[in-house]
Amino acid sequence: SARPWDRSCPAAAYAAGDRRKAVTVLDIEAYKVANPALNITYQVAPYQNTGLYNQKYLPRKGETSGQVELNYSNNFRTIRYADVLLMAAEAFNKSGNDLKAQTYLNLVRRRAFGDLLHDITATGTALYDAILAERRLELAMEGERFFDLVRTGKAASVLGTLGFVAGKHELFPIPQGEVDLAGLTQNPGY
């Protein structure tokens, strides 16, 4: 059966030459095989194991002070420059300035690929789709994808097979105690 966590990591979506995959996704089993002298062990239970790990938040040697559940002492990235560039690209595309949108999008892609060969020249809807695809890759496993899908109205088509219900899952339920205390109206569907 499908495991929801299997779809949170877009490992197969990265193009050849895209350097982001190596710093985003860690195939722990392949890493163990390639580095037998390290004698790597890791705990799976009680978590689901897809075989892939979020490389962005794995602690590095010497960074293992603090709580394991909080990713040790790793900083949580609230916003990144690439995110700002992609937001600008989307805004310029939506306001009809595709040239400016391409410029911001391609700044991100040039860093990712290290060349000019992967620039996007699409316009209109195709450019918009390219910007959204770039957000998926650039911000992979940083907690943005769900909100991008909801914001763009694509959540039901992408997440429907995982149980997403349009008109309900765009919002989280308000804890019942808060509803009772404050006399709030619960979000739809809960």
Model region roles, listed by residue range:
Residues 9-81:
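Flexible, polar/acidic helix-loop-strand segments at domain edges
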Residues 18-21, 75-108, 128-140:
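Extended, hydrophobic/aromatic-rich amphipathic alpha-helical segments that build helical scaffolds
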Residues 14-15, 93, 150:
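Hydrophobic residues in alpha-helical segments
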Residues 31-32, 99-100, 147-148, 156:
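Flexible loop/turn segments at secondary-structure boundaries
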Residues 1-3, 71, 76, 109, ...:
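Long, intrinsically disordered, low-complexity segments
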